[in-house]
UniProtKB/Swiss-Prot annotation:
This is TATA-box-binding protein. The keyword Ribonucleoprotein does not apply. It holds the Pfam family TBP. General factor that plays a role in the activation of archaeal genes transcribed by RNA polymerase. Binds specifically to the TATA box promoter element which lies close to the position of transcription initiation. CDD domains: TBP_archaea. GO terms for biological process: DNA-templated transcription initiation. Sequence repeats lie at residues 9-85, 100-178.
Length: 184
């Protein structure tokens, strides 16, 4: 099984722009089940069941999508929103550019980790490890620019990636570094 096959994407956050300006009160009426309380939060919240995602829509036309497990679900979510808004005669862009802001994924090194030894070997400039405050070791990878959270169980959480390939690169890199010093 390749490294990529062992990586599980938990969440993708992406953004786009649907228009120059949106009337959120009108959209709240068009999107059944949406939540819009401008005195509480400036955006409209709309949750989809399939794919299981949520979008935040702002008056500026900006939209954030969260909860997707793959890029196709992000695209499907945005298309569903566009179709629903157009059906309600709300003018929006046909094919807006979607930008991935963050991918969160998990990986299992399948080996227990001694985080104290790892903190010493990876170098203090890229590592934060304060077990009294947080049980994981925070490892800031410079290339690709992601953050890995390593746990004693061998589980690794990767955050900050913009592409799936960056997660795979970071996992391969940390595995090589830990193997090189005999820590896995």
């Amino acid at each position: 099984m390749s490294e990529r096959e062992k990586i599980t994407i938990e969440n993708i956050v992406a953004s786009t722009s649907l228009a120059e300006h949106l009337d959120l009160s009108r959209i709240a009426l068009a999107l059944d089940g949406s939540e819009y309380e401008p005195e509480q939060f400036p955006g409209l919240i709309y949750r989809l069941q399939e794919p299981k995602t949520a979008v935040l829509i702002f008056r500026s036309g900006k939209v954030n999508c969260t909860g997707a497990k793959n890029i196709e679900d992000v695209k499907r979510t945005i298309k569903i929103i566009i179709d629903k808004l157009k059906a309600a005669d709300i003018e929006v862009y046909d094919d807006p550019q979607i930008i991935v802001q963050n991918i969160v994924a998990v990986y299992d090194l399948e080996s227990e980790l001694n985080l104290t030894d790892i903190a010493m070997s990876l170098g203090l400039e890229n590592v934060e490890y304060e077990p009294e405050q947080f049980p994981g070791l925070v490892y800031r990878v410079e290339e690709p620019r992601v953050v890995l959270l390593l746990f004693g169980s061998g589980k690794v959480v990767c955050t900050g990636a913009k592409e799936e390939s960056e997660i795979e690169q970071a996992v391969i890199k940390v595995k090589k570094e830990l193997q090189k010093v005999g820590l896995i």
